[in-house]
Amino acid sequence: MKYSNVVVAGGGVLGSQIAFQAAYCGFNVTIWLRSEGSIGRTQPKIDHLKQTYIEAIEKMAEDKNAWCAGLADEDTFDKEECLKKVENAYANLKLELDMAKAVADADLVIESMAENEKDKIAFYEKLSPLLPEKTVIVTNSSTLLPSMFAKYTGRPDKYLSLHFANSIWKNNTAEIMTQAQTDEKYFNEVMQFANDIRMIGLPVRKEKSGYLLNSMQECLILKALILHGLEEQVHLKALSRYLIQ
């Protein structure tokens, strides 16, 4: 199934970026938020992203070294068309407090909430009875594994991870990680969605906290500490256990 309606749960730094990028790429996007206070914190992020995208496109038109692959391909770049897509994304992106209303016709729900296990479980338990049969759920969690939450979604076969890097309009990678009950069909659909929002989809077939990129980064940090002779200051053995767990 090709997705049209996307709901992002959470309007933090990455949640707002994911929502704006999907809207920029033509999807109908709603950000579900828990309170009026959340709207007050999220709207300025959306305002800032609009300006960031405009500035990035202007720089791309002047300097190929400033290219943002999440915004356009070099061989088909049209500055005015890209700027129009930014305006459309900003105008059409919706913020919603009513969860039932937000997900009523959702093809994909992207959970991008704080890394708190209890809060995520409560969210999934509230979400589950409200979803249409068609809806696929993904989590953007960077440290908590999808298998921890699959049973609370009510649709473990349609649940997996979709993890983004910060500044996704230029760092355009998306790591797609399954858990034991994920159906291959929905893995493929989410891979396609990642491509549709101009991400490079990186399949992760085994659950791993940190996914691919963070795991690689952690190893590099560890080696750098060794090279700089900082073993004693950072208690290297303890750090090693933490990084590779």
What are these model-derived regions, one by one?
Residues 34, 40-41, 52-136, 144:
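Rossmann-like NAD(P)-binding element
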Residues 43-57, 110, 131, 153, ...:
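Structural signal for hydrophobic packing residues in well-ordered secondary-structure cores
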Residues 1-68, 130, 179:
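NAD(P)+-binding Rossmann beta1-loop-alpha1 motif at the extreme N-terminus of oxidoreductases
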Residues 19-20, 43-44, 121-123, 149-151:
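Short amphipathic alpha-helical segments
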Residues 177, 203-245:
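Substrate-binding/catalytic subdomain of NAD(P)-dependent oxidoreductase enzymes
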Residues 136-215:
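Rossmann-fold dinucleotide-binding core
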